[in-house]
């Protein structure tokens, strides 16, 4: 028996985040998400946060983020939303019912 999975996969369907007029692409490849999980589980410090952003965004997008000069609160919000999207979660799911 041959089971075709091709039509059920989302090849190159990377989520994107828009901030003002900038669009950032989140790396949601399996390899990246597995590395991300390892980073989150073993870290939590500043180096872990930097490693997380390095995994989730391309160098070009990281430079764009840097130029935005975000506050730490906004930076952490961006990181959280990007992690949710990479994991296939709805970033707004935590805010339902408020």
PLM region descriptions:
Residues 3-4, 9-13, 20-98:
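Short, surface-exposed, charged amphipathic helix/loop patches that serve as local interaction elements
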């Amino acid at each position: 028996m041959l089971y075709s999975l091709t039509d059920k996969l989302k090849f190159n369907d990377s989520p994107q985040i828009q901030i003002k007029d900038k669009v950032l692409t989140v790396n949601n490849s399996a390899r990246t998400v597995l590395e991300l999980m390892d980073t989150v589980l073993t870290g939590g410090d500043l180096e872990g946060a930097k490693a997380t952003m390095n995994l989730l965004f391309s160098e070009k997008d990281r430079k764009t983020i840097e130029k935005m000069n975000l506050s730490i609160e906004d930076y952490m919000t961006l990181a959280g939303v990007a992690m949710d999207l990479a994991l296939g979660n709805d970033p707004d799911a935590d805010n339902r019912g408020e």
